[in-house]
Amino acid sequence: MKIDFSMGLVEAEAAEKASSMMSYSDQAEHRLREFCAARLAHSELPQIEKTILFARSLKSENAAHPSVRAYFSHPVRVATLALRLETVPSAEIVQLGLLHNVFEVSGLNESNLLKEGYSRRTAEGIRLLTVDRRRQYDPVYLEAFHRKIETHGEDLALIRCVDRLDNLLAFQLIERTKVIEDYLDLTIRFVVPMASRLSPQFGAYLLKLIAYMREVGCDRQLKERYESFLKEAVETAV
């Protein structure tokens, strides 16, 4: 797989990510639909629309993501960026991006996706992308986890790396703890090499982003604004 890696300045991308976390996904969805219309075959667009509606309609079973409505801009951003980076665009990469975290967030499994009409390869890919949170800081587990993703295909590796990129862009909203430092160290150990195999520029950008986030730390004002937005989103959904 060839990718055309291009991102803005780390500071600008982080600011855009923070803004997306304090608004619902409408604008991000509109951008994804426009991008799909420009890059994919017209016949593929109904399946993309179906996936957007399906993923957005799911209920959260995960306390870390109490509001799917507030969270949904993340998978939309992952899908958009993955499609943007692919030299040869595919509808499957968009589906993988939109669905990449549905097992963890909603409690679905492979059979649920198969019943919805998704391919066995897509359903298996989502399973492989779903990390066992009990072992997420275990290097032995992570070695096998990332190897299976790359064995499945470079498209799945791209989703893994773009997912991590989008998560890292939000780190100004997160308090610094040993767990966070471990997360950054393990990203350097496992995700950066994977990204570098897709594109040397991708790996270098991740390293630059990690260095930036370590330098600026947590912006408490941004964090408080995000927590206020999330609280409102949860209360509105009740």
Where on the chain are the PLM-derived regions?
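Active-site helical microenvironments for divalent-metal-assisted chemistry
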Residues: K2-V238
